[in-house]
Amino acid sequence: MPAFDVICRGEKFAHVELQVPGVHNVKNALAAAASAIALHFPAAAVEEGLAAFHGAGRRFEHKGSFHGAEVYDDYAHHPGELQALFSAVKGMGYERIICAFQPHTYTRTKALFSDFVQVLREPDLAILAEIYAARETDTLGISSRDLAEQIPGSRYCATLEEVTALLREIARPGDLILTVGAGDIY
């Protein structure tokens, strides 16, 4: 997990050890530290407060183990958020990164289709659950199957039950399984 020194006016103010991965969390911690400095909090409060933060619900939230693999859930539903998630987990030492992703809304999937295709090539295996409609009906003729057809080695699952069955079949110790999306995949 990230650890770094906070430098203020050219001097070390605090040493921070985060419990959450990713450059985006380092940036958030630096913003929190800057606010604390502006409000005259002591260095110890910054160090202790940031060390005690274990993340927000559905943001790289550890759910347990499944067939020896570690399972984390994340709310990411936009290509930029997916990129941040994949960047955060890449150096964590897992043998394989398996992402079970459920796109959120037909309009977002259609509008960001090529960006989703690009970023979902990053995990070792992308499993595409069907799009979570939310407030929409499919008037665009788009499916997660369309994404899967553009991502080499990916798998399409029409239902969440199919996602679970596939994970049961392929998960093994050393894997990181990410359930990802703003719908009901978690």
Residue ranges and their predicted role:
Residues 1-14:
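Acidic-glycine-rich active-site phosphate/pyrophosphate-binding loop
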Residues 17-18:
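Histidine-centered acyl-transfer/condensation active-site motif
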Residues 11, 21-24, 31-186:
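ATP-dependent carboxylate-amine ligase
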Residues 5, 24-25:
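C-terminal accessory "lid"/substrate-recognition subdomains
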